[in-house]
Amino acid sequence: MNIIGPDKIVFGVDDVATCQQFVIDYGLVQQDDYNYVALDGTGIEIRQIDDPSLPAALPTSTMLRKTIYGVADQATVDAIYAELSKDREVKTLEDGSIETVDDLGFAIGFQITIRKELDLPAEMVNAPGAKQKRAVNDIGVSKDFTPKPRSLSHVVYFVPDAVKAEKFYAERLGFVTTDRFTNTGPF
């Protein structure tokens, strides 16, 4: 399946104003009353914890309500629908995206990605084995620099059954584990 990555993470929170200020300070751009985006259009949605438009809360203290993954095309949305509807309800929403829950109860959605292609220079960093790009102790950015996150690149779930979660995402959706936290779970 051609899943590109998370397009949006949706939260239900106790203190909307503080959370909004945090993400603005982080560098996300306010798109509307609820949505805050990175340069490529991916981002987060912040709503009041009891907002009726949100998926049901998990029986934990997590504020995460839904992860919406961007996919390459409608054929991928259709393939995910066909695969996941074998053993669970999958809803098609008004915008053509689909919504369901994973094996641990997290609400997940899939849509044709909203990511915009970026054409930006790489950041000036020195890395082991690479040609030096800037002098030692030179600041890598201007002191007047305002951070602007480029993309929402990943989401981390801390779950009670990492093996079950990994199995769902790998076997049902084709995710590939690239790294692991010892005794915690996969990436």
Predicted regions and their residues:
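N-terminal beta-strand motif that seeds the catalytic metal site of vicinal oxygen chelate
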Residues: M1-A17, K66-T67, E123-V163
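Core segments of cupin and vicinal oxygen chelate
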Residues: M1-D50, E99-D102, Y157-F187
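A broad, low-specificity signal for short, low-complexity segments enriched in glycine/proline
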Residues: I4-V10, V23-Q30, P59-T60, I114-L118, ...
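Vicinal oxygen chelate
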Residues: G5-V13, T42-E45, P55-K148, S151-P160, ...
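Short acidic, gly/pro-rich beta-turn/loop elements at beta-sheet edges
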Residues: Q21, A56, V77-A79, L120, ...
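Short amphipathic alpha-helices in soluble, non-transmembrane regions
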Residues: Q21-Y26, I80-K86
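Conserved donor-binding loop and adjoining core beta-sheet/short helix segment
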Residues: Q30-A72, G96-E99, Q111-T113
